[in-house]
Amino acid sequence: MAKSKGARIVITLECSDKAGEFAQKRKPGVFRYTTTKNRRNTPSRIELNKFCPNCNQHCIFKEIK
């Protein structure tokens, strides 16, 4: 019998700073973090305040697929 995957899943967090589009950036493009979350404890999408090296400032990172 195969084991179930469990409640932990890998998610991707993407920088959602729209003001950073027009500001000076270090590099072009969008920065992403990967992390895990417990599906049972946090069923909704996560939003975290993390540092974005592209925008060179702290931004809100939103969960994507």
From Swiss-Prot:
Top-level taxon in the UniProt lineage: Eukaryota
Keywords, sorted A to Z: Chloroplast, Plastid, Ribonucleoprotein, Ribosomal protein
Matching InterPro entries: Ribosomal_bL33, Ribosomal_bL33_CS, Ribosomal_bL33_sf, Ribosomal_zn-bd
GO CC entries: chloroplast; ribonucleoprotein complex; ribosome
Subcellular locations according to the entry: Plastid, Chloroplast
GO biological process: translation
Keyword match Transmembrane helix: no
A GO MF term: structural constituent of ribosome
This protein's record includes keyword Mitochondrion: no
Chief site of localization: plastid
Family matches, as Gene3D superfamilies: Ribosomal protein L33
Family under the similarity heading: Belongs to the bacterial ribosomal protein bL33 family.
HAMAP family: Ribosomal_bL33
Record-given protein name: Large ribosomal subunit protein bL33c
Species whose genome carries this gene: Pyropia yezoensis
Taxonomic path: Eukaryota, Rhodophyta, Bangiophyceae, Bangiales, Bangiaceae
